[in-house]
Swiss-Prot record:
Family: Belongs to the FAH family.
GO MF, one annotated term: fumarylpyruvate hydrolase activity
Pathway: Aromatic compound metabolism; naphthalene degradation
Main EC class the enzyme belongs to: hydrolase
Alphabetical list of InterPro entries matching this protein: Fumarylacetoacetase-like_C, Fumarylacetoacetase_C_sf
EC number in record: 3.7.1.20
GO biological process terms, semicolon-separated: naphthalene catabolic process
Cofactor names: Mg(2+); Mn(2+)
This protein's UniProt keywords: Aromatic hydrocarbons catabolism, Hydrolase, Metal-binding, Plasmid, Pyruvate
Function: Involved in the catabolism of gentisate (2,5-dihydroxybenzoate) a key intermediates in the aerobic pathways for the metabolism of a large number of aromatic compoun such as naphthalene. Catalyzes the hydrolytic cleavage of fumarylpyruvate to form fumarate and pyruvate.
Name of the coding gene: nagK
Biological source species: Ralstonia sp
Catalysed reaction, written as an equation: 3-fumarylpyruvate + H2O = fumarate + pyruvate + H(+)
Annotated binding of a divalent metal cation, by residue: 41, 43, 72
Protein name: Fumarylpyruvate hydrolase
Lineage: Bacteria, Pseudomonadati, Pseudomonadota, Betaproteobacteria, Burkholderiales
Amino acid sequence: MGRPVDKSVEQAFYFTKSPQTLVESGATVAYPPRTSNYHYEMELVLAIGKPGFRVSEDQAHELIYGYAAGLDMTRRDLQLVARDKGRPWDTGKDIEEGSVCSEIVPMQGVVVEQGAIALEVNGQTKQSSNVDKLIWNVREIIADLSTYYHLQPGDLIYTGTPEGVGAVVAGDKIIGRVEGIAEISLTVGPAE
């Protein structure tokens, strides 16, 4: 996110989200509490279809059920405070109705290696990139994550966002897409 990564010395890192963060594409969600800097992050989402633990990169495709387009909405102000203090990012990332997901497109065993990924806010392009620019590709993510957890059918893995993240306000309409996968939409409603 906004800085170069040397994969030879840095490891991928992950965070988890509670089930109540998941919301279907097309929803209107309230601007969340305790933030004044709510950001979009457009992502390719992969859906796990078979259990796996300590899976090699060569076997990673065997766990793939399919893909979706997703939005990882973030309380950026809270995330940055936590990051700078070396604390967990939970309050910045684990937001009710903050994980927007399209329908899952079944693509068993397929490894998506490229495809345009884009996001618009109120008709203006904010993110435009390609899946081939992911820091860690789909095979690497599955293999690495499976060294920490027993991956299970139904697990959704958001794979990271391209450059161009930014803030939204109540009333904004977000449309995102991953080429060959799906399109998603979200309207940001007023705060509760």
